[in-house]
């Protein structure tokens, strides 16, 4: 067992009030009110068994040791096809509702689930992820974890994961070690279906997401048939590199599918690249830390769902890559928004070819435990929240509006880019990892 694994599995204690209040892998980090973008995501996979045996109330607690941020190596490819498939599947059909997800967060949970399975159950997960073997998956997942995690004064992106074990079942130690070593999974053991354990799980989720998803976390509960609960989270915040001036904000109509609503718009005139394709236009706003937020606006008469079937749009949202940008003076109006959604992933994952893990008659969880049969995934819940505003943005050290000897000539093209109808967005790292993607139907 590695040193990291020993740290994660060495402690066994009873549930205490302090644990329930603060269960989780804590990081000492300041709370900064000046972040303009705060987003969080959580995915919970509940694995249940058809058989139940009562047990004690001991809870094993340990905290994962997180390595520092590293760029994605050149020889590691991100699972762009998986990111695109997840984004299209779970953002389509939102109707009048807003929808948001974290492709990276879902990917990490699916990768951990692949470690717990074998046979066709694992093969279906690997096919969706787009990788040939679990060994290659581990290398990819570890690299993505390090590339997607980091904290500085400019940008915070924090991944976390945990496994919650039933106290009357034995688990395969090698598999638990892998979850600790590759996925930095903190481990907990307790009596499933109790209010104490549920409160500890909810407390861990709230700790990792800084309380942004408290209502959604409160809905996560175990029952006596739960064999293992797997949780993966992502918290993110960053500053714009060029601020919006609050004095320029204005209120106007947003043409939502269900009817016009008032929205508060942030406004700026910026020199930037403008991207367009058949039925859409897009702009990229830079975030400190090298990240970016993309806004994709369908043309009049084109729906957001239609763009989710556009290969070029999906590549842009999933990788941050786009062709054919034109340098322009863009008059940009962006509605302030705070959107949250909670998704049941089971039907969508089945549509993407992952079926066996949900069927106790055919699922294969032998890498996890030999103590129970007919094990299956009974619940797969993903919650995410994204909010943006203009507050607290520091003045940029440099800006494209500042004249200089090497600045490009003023563009002839002028674009009025007003997000006053349903639009898509994504938050992408400098490595091309899609941390968040969403559709705003009503800001």
Locate predicted features.
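Disordered, charged N-terminal biogenesis/targeting segments of membrane/secreted proteins
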Residues: 1-29
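Post-signal peptide N-terminal segment of secreted/secretory-pathway proteins
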Residues: 89-157
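Non-catalytic, conformational "gating/processing" segments within enzyme and secreted inhibitor domains
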Residues: 57-62, 96, 134-301, 322-410
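Short Gly/aromatic-enriched secondary-structure transition segments
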Residues: 125-129, 244-253, 304-314
């Amino acid at each position: 067992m590695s040193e990291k694994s020993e740290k994660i599995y060495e402690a066994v204690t009873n549930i205490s009030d302090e644990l329930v209040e603060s269960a989780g892998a804590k990081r000492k980090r300041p709370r900064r009110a000046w972040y303009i973008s705060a987003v969080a995501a959580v995915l919970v996979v509940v694995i249940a068994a058809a058989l139940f045996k009562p047990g004690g109330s001991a809870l094993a607690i340990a905290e994962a040791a997180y390595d520092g941020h590293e760029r994605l190596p050149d020889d590691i490819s991100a699972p762009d096809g998986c990111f695109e498939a997840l984004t299209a599947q779970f953002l389509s059909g939102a109707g009048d509702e807003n929808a948001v997800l974290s492709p990276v967060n879902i990917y990490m949970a699916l990768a951990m689930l692949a470690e717990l399975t074998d046979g066709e159950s694992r093969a279906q997960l690997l096919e969706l992820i787009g990788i040939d073997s679990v060994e290659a998956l581990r290398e990819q997942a570890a690299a993505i974890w390090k590339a997607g995690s980091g904290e500085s004064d400019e940008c915070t992106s924090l991944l976390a994961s945990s496994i919650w074990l039933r106290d009357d079942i034995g688990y395969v130690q090698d598999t638990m070690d892998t979850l600790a070593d590759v996925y930095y999974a903190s481990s907990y053991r307790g009596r499933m279906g109790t209010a104490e354990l549920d409160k500890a799980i909810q407390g861990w989720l709230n700790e990792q997401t800084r309380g942004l998803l408290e209502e959604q976390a409160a809905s996560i509960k175990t029952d006596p048939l739960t064999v293992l609960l797997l949780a993966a989270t992502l918290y993110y915040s960053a500053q714009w590199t060029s601020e919006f001036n609050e004095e320029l904000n204005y209120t106007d109509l947003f043409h939502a599918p269900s009817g016009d609503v008032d929205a508060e718009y942030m406004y700026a005139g910026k020199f930037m690249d403008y991207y367009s394709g058949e039925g859409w236009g897009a702009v990229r706003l830079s975030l400190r830390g090298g990240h970016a937020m993309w806004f994709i606006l369908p043309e009049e008469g084109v729906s957001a769902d239609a763009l989710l079937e556009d290969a070029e749009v999906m590549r842009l949202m999933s990788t941050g890559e786009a062709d054919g940008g034109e340098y322009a003076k863009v008059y940009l109006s962006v509605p302030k928004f705070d959107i949250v959604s909670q998704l049941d992933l089971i039907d969508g994952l089945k549509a993407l070819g992952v079926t066996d893990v949900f069927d106790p008659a055919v699922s294969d969880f032998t890498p996890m435990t030999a103590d129970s049969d007919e094990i299956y995934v009974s619940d797969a819940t993903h919650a995410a929240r994204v909010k943006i505003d203009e507050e607290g943005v520091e003045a940029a050290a440099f800006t494209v509006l500042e004249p200089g000897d090497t600045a490009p000539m003023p563009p002839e093209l002028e674009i009025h880019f007003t997000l006053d109808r349903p639009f898509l967005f994504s938050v992408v790292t400098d490595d091309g990892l899609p941390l968040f993607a969403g559709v705003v139907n009503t800001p």
